[in-house]
Amino acid sequence: MSKVRILLADDHPYFSDMVERILGSGFEIIGKVDDGRALLDAAMRLTPDLILTDISMPVLNGIDAVDELRKQGCPSKVIFLTVHADADFVRTCVAAGAFGYIVKPRVAADLLVAIRRVLAGHLFISTYDADERGLA
């Protein structure tokens, strides 16, 4: 069976490198980009199985990029990896075409499970409660 082909979009290289380490050798990273416009170009050119993207990026944000990819017929599944834990962001991302939403503090714990669920056609939304935010 061939490896899942992933395009990674985040404007913080340290975070992208961490995600790549979490994924390990079980996946093929076919591209890494650092802004939404580059995400559009790479996704249409490379047709990844899965796109892992941030919301807040320069040039074009991740939500608008994913919305545009859907309009252009890109079949790639999308999981957002973001600092935004607000439910409004989750709804907006799902409406734009995302199948997954992980808040960055939960990436190490949730990413591999999220990928399996999303590739199986299910929605995955990570939880991030007050205890994890240090608010409890």
What spans do the regions from the language model cover?
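Short acidic/polar segment at the start of the alpha1 helix of CheY-like receiver
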Residues: 12-16, 89, 125
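Two-component/phosphorelay signaling modules centered on CheY-like receiver
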Residues: 13-31
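Short, flexible helix-to-coil linker/hinge segments that flank and couple to helix-turn-helix
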Residues: 90-94, 100-136
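Active-site beta3 strand of CheY-like receiver
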Residues: 46-52
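Receiver (REC) domain active-site loop signature in two-component systems and cognate sites
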Residues: 57
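Active-site residues of response regulator receiver
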Residues: 54, 82
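Acidic catalytic/metal-coordinating carboxylates
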Residues: 35-38, 61-64
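Conserved sequence signature across two-component system core domains
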Residues: 9-10, 33, 51
